[in-house]
């Protein structure tokens, strides 16, 4: 039976994390390796799907490894092809979510089918819908999609005991950047504004180091490493490590032996990257985060001096230059009370607790990050809902026809901030037909936008004259139909079963190898201690198991393993009994010797002694 608990998942670009409410506090669930975060990496090898640390470790040698898929979620037409099979970003994300779901279930000891999943605050509707689809494919009922900065504010605010304050959350992750301004007080978490860049994060900082290394190596050796896939993967790993090292030390050594080969033989890469050089390489990336901070403050109607706390979120906020920049822009020393890698998952778990009723007196008021509207005459974008409007929300406006006797109107739904429709993102199109013939401007067409608590959009158009209505729920522009999602769910389940079966096979083979080793050792220990018939029986059973192993007959291996286990167990009991008997005999012998010793004492001769003074002769 499924648990009533709702897990909180931070589905990150480079790393993911999961948490659950434990009493009145959220708690991170560690993965099978014991780590608190899991690399968002999927690899395909020999028909097997690997996720997390094990997938990341073999990325250098396996070209069928997918990382940072979150950067493409909701992207129309984007697919990754491995061994002739294409995967959408939703499917790859679902593999990560399935893995997280499985180890969360192992931790809780019960099935989990409900989750709160976080997304960057600046994700548009199609990206949110695609994230929800990924959860569904993984077998999760996604109860809520919440924004990452909002989630981290929940993790922070839970310990503030209802204190009234305005906070700015600066969230720089592996692939996305968000900034949100919130007002906290009496258990109410109200988002005042949000801004960001969905294509800016730690990956971009890594890329700056990679580009620098490629340029330096080309200058030194005349070889372009950017054309070598395996070398690039090694460079990526080295760049990520150097970036992390430079958060704690002033220079990082980058050493990659045998990175390539030239006419004279193997070539090695040896470089020292100082923090000053790194800051110079990435200065433009840090600067790109400034405008969103200023815009978020402006939209919230606040100045930097009115912010009480600045919360840093995301692994990339460990970069000293980022921390210094935020301090300069806000005039505040950033608050380091929450772990930037874990806060989002913890906050998602709090939201899960709110939904189940385990967390009381917490109200979350989030906002839509981008304006929503439709295309009107002349290709103009007419907004119906402005950005930073608190959700859920609903807004309607009446439009009319642009031509006489127009029988239908096309509703082109858009999201963005640009004045012209062509410059904004299309969320969907639908048509309201059978409009009665009338001069232009006469028909009354009411267009209504609804945004639900997940930030997902529903649009309807109604002819007020006839009452005829047409509705659309905006689907992800990556175009997954319900049938496709159902098919992917089925495939994910089948893969899960196949992976489970494969693991059982590996476990069985390991158990067989171990049993054969144990049998050989036991038989050696029993030489001359049990009858030849018993030894032969064990050897025959061992040979039967070895034959089943050689024939790769799994059913026979199971049966023969059980047979041999019983025989070896019986022999081991005999060996143990013999050892006990030998100990008993030894103890009896010791007692007998003790008796003899006592008898000897009776014949002891008492002698006289005289104390001699060694100095007597010298006196």
Swiss-Prot record:
What keywords are annotated for this sequence in UniProt?
A: ATP-binding, Chaperone, Nucleotide-binding, Phosphoprotein, Stress response
Name the domain of life. Bacteria
Pfam families, A to Z: HSP70
Q: Which GO terms describe its molecular function?
A: ATP binding; ATP-dependent protein folding chaperone; unfolded protein binding
The recorded induction information for this protein reads: By stress conditions e.g. heat shock.
Q: Which Gene3D superfamilies match?
A: 1.20.1270.10, 3.30.420.40, Actin, Chain A, domain 4, Substrate Binding Domain Of DNAk, Chain A, domain 1
**Biased composition regions of type Acidic residues, renumbered to the chain:** 608-619
Please give the residue positions where the record annotates the modification Phosphothreonine.
176
Question: PANTHER family under this entry?
Answer: HEAT SHOCK PROTEIN 70KDA
What name is this protein filed under?
Answer: Chaperone protein DnaK
């Amino acid at each position: 039976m499924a648990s009533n608990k709702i897990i909180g998942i931070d589905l990150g670009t480079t790393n993911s994390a999961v948490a659950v409410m434990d009493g009145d506090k959220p708690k991170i669930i560690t993965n099978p390796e014991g780590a608190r975060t899991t690399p968002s990496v999927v690899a395909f090898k020999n028909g097997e799907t690997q996720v997390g640390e094990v997938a990341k470790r073999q990325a250098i040698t396996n070209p069928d490894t997918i990382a940072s898929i979150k950067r493409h979620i909701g992207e129309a037409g984007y697919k990754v092809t491995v061994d002739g099979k294409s995967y959408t970003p939703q499917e790859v994300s679902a593999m990560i979510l399935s893995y997280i779901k499985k180890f969360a279930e192992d931790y809780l000891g019960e099935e989990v089918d409900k989750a709160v999943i976080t997304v960057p605050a600046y994700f548009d509707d199609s990206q949110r819908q695609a994230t929800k689809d990924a959860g569904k494919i993984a077998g999760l009922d996604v109860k809520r999609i919440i924004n990452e900065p909002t989630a981290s504010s929940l993790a922070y605010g839970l310990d503030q005991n209802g204190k009234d304050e305005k906070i700015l959350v600066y969230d720089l992750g592996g692939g996305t950047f968000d900034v949100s301004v919130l007002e906290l007080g009496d258990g109410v978490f109200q988002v005042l504004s949000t801004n960001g860049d969905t294509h800016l994060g730690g990956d971009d900082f890594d890329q700056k180091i990679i580009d620098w290394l490629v340029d330096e190596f080309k200058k030194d050796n005349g070889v372009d490493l950017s054309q070598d896939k395996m070398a690039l993967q090694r460079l990526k790993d080295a760049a990520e490590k150097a970036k992390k090292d430079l958060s704690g030390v002033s220079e990082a050594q980058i050493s990659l032996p045998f990175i390539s080969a030239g006419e004279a033989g193997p070539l090695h890469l040896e470089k020292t990257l100082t923090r000053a050089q790194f800051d110079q390489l990435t200065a433009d990336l840090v600067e790109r985060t400034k405008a969103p901070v200023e815009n978020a403050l402006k939209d919230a109607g606040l100045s930097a001096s009115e912010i009480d706390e600045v919360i840093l979120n995301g692994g990339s906020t460990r970069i000293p230059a980022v921390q210094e920049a935020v301090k300069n822009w806000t005039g505040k020393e950033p608050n380091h009370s929450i772990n930037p890698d874990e806060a989002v998952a913890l906050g998602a778990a709090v939201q899960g607790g709110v939904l189940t009723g385990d967390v009381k007196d917490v109200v979350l008021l989030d906002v839509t990050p981008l304006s929503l509207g439709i295309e009107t005459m002349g290709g103009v974008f007419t907004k119906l809902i402005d950005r930073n409007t608190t959700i859920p929300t609903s807004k309607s406006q009446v439009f009319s026809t642009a031509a006489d006797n127009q029988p239908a109107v096309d509703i082109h739904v858009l999201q963005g901030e640009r004045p012209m429709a062509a410059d904004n993102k299309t969320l969907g199109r639908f048509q309201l037909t059978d409009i009665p013939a009338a001069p232009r401007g006469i028909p009354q067409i009411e267009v209504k936008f609804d945004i639900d608590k997940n930030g997902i959009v529903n649009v309807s158009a109604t002819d007020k004259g006839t009452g005829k209505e047409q509705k659309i729920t905006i689907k992800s522009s990556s175009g997954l139909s319900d049938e496709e999602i159902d098919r992917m769910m089925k495939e994910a389940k089948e893969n899960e079963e196949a992976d489970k079966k494969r693991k059982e096979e590996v476990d069985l083979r390991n158990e067989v190898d171990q049993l054969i080793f144990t049998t050989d050792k036991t038989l050696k220990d029993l030489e001359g201690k049990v009858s030849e018939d018993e030894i032969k029986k064990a050897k025959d059973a061992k040979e039967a198991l070895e034959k089943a192993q050689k024939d790769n007959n799994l059913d026979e291996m199971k049966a023969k393993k059980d047979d041999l286990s019983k025989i070896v167990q019986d022999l081991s009991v005999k060996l143990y009994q013999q050892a006990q008997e030998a100990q008993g005999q030894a103890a009896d012998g010791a007692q007998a010797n003790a008796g003899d010793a006592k008898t000897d004492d009776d014949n002891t001769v008492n002698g006289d002694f005289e104390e001699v003074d060694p100095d007597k002769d010298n006196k």
